[in-house]
């Protein structure tokens, strides 16, 4: 059986196979270590604007999105995200602005129109194996490199596995290998 190794360069539009450049990483936030993987779903409260639960996951709609210090264009840009589909957590709402948090714990404000409800994930830690069935003994479909982004198709609340797709490959990935879904969360 052949294994496909998906690398970040293959997922970026226009990236040459022979030329792989690391993506910029947001600056480290002093006095705030990167969050540890969650073991329980967070307590949720209704958003003040939409009434939808907070926190909740969304994804970046465009390949260039400014993260601002506050909810408005008068606030300075602190960072520019350059990866469409990147999963983020919406942690607060104000008018048409959403305070988001990325996998590294960096927070800031973006316009709601720059976010999509599409559920995506980011492979965290080391390489992760995409399996044909939700079982460690199932055949491998692909090896996913750290930082690869994919789409969450569904997650059963009681399952340690989620059905996902990445660059045309479809299979099952353990929740602990991805960032973009809460422990015990059901995604349909």
What are these regions (language model features)?
Residues 2-6, 129:
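N-terminal low-complexity, intrinsically disordered tails enriched in Ser/Pro/Gly
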Residues 5-13:
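Bacterial N-terminal signal peptides
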Residues 16-20:
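Boundary at the C-terminal end of the N-terminal hydrophobic targeting segment
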Residues 21-69, 80-84, 91-94, 101-134, ...:
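SH3-family beta-barrel domains
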Residues 73:
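A short, aromatic/hydrophobic, helix- or strand-capping loop or linear motif
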Residues 76-77:
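Beta-strand-rich domains and repeat architectures in extracellular enzymes and scaffolds
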């Amino acid at each position: 059986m052949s294994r496909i190794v998906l690398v970040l360069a293959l997922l970026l539009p226009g990236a040459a196979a022979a030329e792989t450049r690391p993506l910029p990483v947001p600056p480290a936030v002093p006095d705030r270590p990167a969050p540890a993987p969650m073991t329980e779903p967070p307590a949720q409260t209704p958003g003040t604007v939409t009434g939808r639960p907070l926190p909740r996951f969304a994804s970046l709609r465009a390949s260039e999105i400014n993260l601002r210090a506050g909810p408005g264009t008068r606030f300075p840009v602190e960072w520019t995200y350059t990866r469409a589909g990147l999963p983020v957590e919406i942690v607060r709402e104000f008018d048409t602005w959403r305070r988001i948090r990325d996998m590294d714990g960096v927070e800031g404000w973006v316009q709601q129109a720059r976010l999509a409800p599409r559920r995506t994930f980011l492979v965290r830690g080391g390489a992760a194996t995409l399996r044909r069935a939700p079982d460690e003994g199932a055949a491998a479909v692909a090896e996913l490199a750290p930082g690869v982004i994919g789409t969450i198709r569904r997650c059963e609340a009681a399952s340690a596995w989620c059905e996902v797709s990445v660059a045309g490959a479809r299979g099952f990935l353990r929740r602990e290998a991805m960032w973009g879904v809460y422990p015990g969360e059901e995604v349909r």
